[in-house]
């Protein structure tokens, strides 16, 4: 009974939205308009500016790689994500590429482009255009917790392990580390598997 209205909502969102993020906001606001949903644009300049100190440390100290690799050296679980020497992307229109630091030349290169920055140029870029930088999987939780602090994170086993390998990084940046709660899960056992379990007395 709602097919026509849903089609109109999707059409309005994805044909008239300025970009994918804007279209998704239109869609979610339409679907949850009666529930007071708050939508945050992770690429907002002010939000990114709040994380400028993390970006600067990442670019000029490469702390994430050192800290996370120290944790992984004695980590009791399989590594969920491995750090690079710079865990940031550089963004421009139709461009999202890794930032690579070349210590021998002391320059930063934007992967798959001819764009390079000196340290001073990159410091200025962060100051003037923090929205041009985006965290990868290692830094994203820190950005999120700094901008929108949460008390607890509920996740599966792999997700909890992922958070645990970043705990020291949170402490280094003086960002409160949320409580971790393992979500309920279940395993569906079919008849054949159940027979084997019974036979093995498991």
Spans of model-derived segments:
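N-terminal targeting/trafficking signals and adjacent low-complexity tails
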Residues: 1-202
């Amino acid at each position: 009974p709602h097919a026509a209205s849903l089609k109109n909502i999707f059409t309005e969102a994805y044909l008239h939205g300025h970009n994918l993020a804007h279209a998704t906001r239109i869609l979610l606001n339409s679907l949850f308009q009666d529930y007071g949903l708050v939508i945050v644009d992770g690429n907002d300049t002010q939000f990114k500016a709040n994380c400028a100190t993390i970006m600067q440390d990442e670019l000029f100290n490469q702390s994430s790689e050192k800290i996370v690799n120290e944790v992984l050296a004695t980590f009791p679980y399989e590594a969920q994500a491995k750090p690079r020497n710079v865990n940031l992307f550089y963004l421009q229109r139709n461009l999202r590429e890794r930032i690579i630091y070349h210590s021998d030349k002391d320059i930063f290169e934007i992967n798959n482009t001819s764009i390079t920055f000196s340290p001073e140029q990159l410091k200025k870029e962060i100051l003037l255009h923090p929205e041009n930088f985006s965290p990868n999987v290692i830094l994203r939780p820190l950005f999120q917790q700094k901008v929108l602090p949460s008390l607890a994170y509920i996740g599966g086993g792999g997700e909890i392990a992922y958070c645990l390998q970043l705990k020291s990084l949170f402490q280094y940046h003086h960002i409160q580390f949320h409580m971790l709660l393992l979500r309920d899960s279940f395993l569906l056992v079919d008849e054949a598997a159940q027979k084997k379990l019974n036979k093995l007395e498991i």
